[in-house]
Amino acid sequence: MAARLLRGSLRVLGGHRAPRQLPAARCSHSGGEERLETPSAKKLTDIGIRRIFSPEHDIFRKSVRKFFQEEVIPHHSEWEKAGEVSREVWEKAGKQGLLGVNIAEHLGGIGGDLYSAAIVWEEQAYSNCSGPGFSIHSGIVMSYITNHGSEEQIKHFIPQMTAGKCIGAIAMTEPGAGSDLQGIKTNAKKDGSDWILNGSKVFISNGSLSDVVIVVAVTNHEAPSPAHGISLFLVENGMKGFIKGRKLHKMGLKAQDTAELFFEDIRLPASALLGEENKGFYYIMKELPQERLLIADVAISASEFMFEETRNYVKQRKAFGKTVAHLQTVQHKLAELKTHICVTRAFVDNCLQLHEAKRLDSATACMAKYWASELQNSVAYDCVQLHGGWGYMWEYPIAKAYVDARVQPIYGGTNEIMKELIAREIVFDK
């Protein structure tokens, strides 16, 4: 895996010679000297400070950080105005090996592990550029296809997706069904060996740019429970009856295209069914822990970014004849923020280790998502406050981070639902 990561890093760095080997870190997959860990680091976003990562991961992280600095940050304001990113950046990300990082090499990936995928999630959060929907495409859509798709589906979609030529989305939410997934109305009825799909979806990330969409639909109205009558379908752009509605005007995530999708008598071949008929709800439940862990990791990474942005600001902003950082109330607030962030980072890193070992359960993933996204919003509020009036100005990065944070407790299952699921495991544990 180390060699594959180095090859992936060199794609981004544009080099031809492997970087010098660094001393190995003491972590779950390499021995050696102990790392500083986040609380002792000069900056929470420093490279080489967390025990779950190896020296090869650090090299890969440097290359990913370079990609976001050079290919994403300079264009993000332009994408915010357009309401979507360019297809060009998707293909650039594909060429650099940043899409489907943990996909096997023969399918176009670099064969990395979960930690490698997490590096891409985290570095996008550190860039404060929420536009590219890489994490949804790679961490969610591609996972469904590789884990539950047929060999033909995997060969057809995955190489194009890792190349950034086929953009993926997943369509669960409907105008009348959000967290209540069992209340969906979109349906697919059999017609010979084909399926006829009808319905609509809303709040679909990557919706406008999507080339393939995983659509959640009811396929058995007579099932003993709605959960036993749901299936997943792969709907491709250009299919007759597949209509992309308006891009939704959101409070945050300005550069991330979010759309309404409509399905009007779409005739789907049997090969469009993802996995087995009526097993869709089971697949969703199996994939949700990773989606919620992804949200948690992005949330704590965004919190680390906001803290560093604010630390820098208060150290140079002057008031009452000295920098704001010299005020005791500001110092105490910074101390609180760093403590909360470091404690949460330790928990999320533990969840990453559990998931890499295939031991992350649903309730723990819910705790990570709930806690980290709540913290992200709390940190955003306090960091804007510490910026004063300038924190309310759109040209300041903290303002963008503030509005982007608000959706985190909502998608992936609202935090109210997270508490329900956590409580259910506590009360009804057998």
UniProtKB/Swiss-Prot annotation:
Which reaction(s) does the protein catalyse, per the Swiss-Prot or TrEMBL entry?
a long-chain 2,3-saturated fatty acyl-CoA + oxidized [electron-transfer flavoprotein] + H(+) = a long-chain (2E)-enoyl-CoA + reduced [electron-transfer flavoprotein]; hexanoyl-CoA + oxidized [electron-transfer flavoprotein] + H(+) = (2E)-hexenoyl-CoA + reduced [electron-transfer flavoprotein]; octanoyl-CoA + oxidized [electron-transfer flavoprotein] + H(+) = (2E)-octenoyl-CoA + reduced [electron-transfer flavoprotein]; decanoyl-CoA + oxidized [electron-transfer flavoprotein] + H(+) = (2E)-decenoyl-CoA + reduced [electron-transfer flavoprotein]
**N6-acetyllysine PTM positions:** 42, 66, 81, 92, 95, 254, 279, 318, 322, 358
Q: List the disulfide bonds.
A: none
At what positions is N6-succinyllysine found? 66, 81, 165, 240, 254, 279, 322
* Pfam families noted in UniProt: Acyl-CoA_dh_1 (PF00441), Acyl-CoA_dh_M (PF02770), Acyl-CoA_dh_N (PF02771)
Q: Which residues take part in binding substrate? A: 179, 227-228, 282, 289-292, 412-413
Q: Give the top-level enzyme category.
A: oxidoreductase
Which residues act catalytically here? 291
Where is the PTM Phosphoserine found along the chain?
54, 362
Q: Which residues participate in FAD binding?
A: 170-179, 203-205, 317, 328, 385-389, 414-416
What molecular functions are annotated in GO for this chain? flavin adenine dinucleotide binding; long-chain fatty acyl-CoA dehydrogenase activity; protein homodimerization activity
**Does the keyword Cytoplasm belong to this entry?**
no
- Which Gene Ontology CC terms are recorded? cytoplasm; mitochondrial matrix; mitochondrial membrane; mitochondrion
**What GO terms describe the biological role, i.e. biological process, of this protein?**
carnitine catabolic process; carnitine metabolic process, CoA-linked; fatty acid beta-oxidation using acyl-CoA dehydrogenase; lipid catabolic process; long-chain fatty acid catabolic process; negative regulation of fatty acid biosynthetic process; negative regulation of fatty acid oxidation; positive regulation of cold-induced thermogenesis
Necessary cofactors: FAD
Q: What does this protein do?
A: Long-chain specific acyl-CoA dehydrogenase is one of the acyl-CoA dehydrogenases that catalyze the first step of mitochondrial fatty acid beta-oxidation, an aerobic process breaking down fatty acids into acetyl-CoA and allowing the production of energy from fats.
| Record-stated family | Belongs to the acyl-CoA dehydrogenase family.
Q: What is the name attached to this protein's record? A: Long-chain specific acyl-CoA dehydrogenase, mitochondrial
Gene coding for it = ACADL
